[in-house]
Amino acid sequence: MIDDERFAEAIRRIDEANGEDPRRELVDGTAQARELLFARRVCDWVRKLVAEPSEELLLAARGHTLQRWMIPRDRYPKTTPGYRQWRKALAAFHADQAAGILQEVGYSETTITRVRALILREDWRDDPEGRALEDADCLVFLETKLEGYLDEWEEKKTVNILKKTLRKMSPAGLGHAGSLRLSDRCAELLRQAKS
């Protein structure tokens, strides 16, 4: 059973930390912290994908990219191994940051360990909650971030990234991906990735 006060305080602290993101995104004419928006969107998707999401899953969804801007991509080589090193460092950082907040607000070690496992994507393919978090993450990427990369990436690279994204998704997640409202260009690239 969710302790509403403790949960609300944990979410407030996670949101406060993500609200410090210097990168901004315009939403309805208002500049908002990018990581805060991303975390909220992932949480919203988790709630759509899972009828009764656990407290741990909701905490992981909100904190799985906690203060991502603190470890920029350009600190690592622009290679596939460099990308993987960066992602591994990010996951550990996010898990540590989230665990610190959860400990401060009084969560048990059992809950903290579970949230860390979800953030670190431990055995996520065999874990329904891990799959839901991955689906939510992928759906938010497709829905809100893909368009921004189109001018940066070559078409072949974009299709390759989309293929990898789709391979990570469950059948339910793929069903939702097919119903996203995307630009014509994004929809065409997604279609190419599926074929």
Residue ranges and their predicted role:
Residues 70, 75, 80, 146, ...:
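Solvent-exposed, flexible loop/coil residues
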Residues 55-76, 98, 117-123, 137:
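His-Asp-centered metal-binding catalytic motifs of divalent-metal-dependent phosphohydrolases/nucleases
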Residues 74-117:
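Helix-adjacent hinge/juxtasegments
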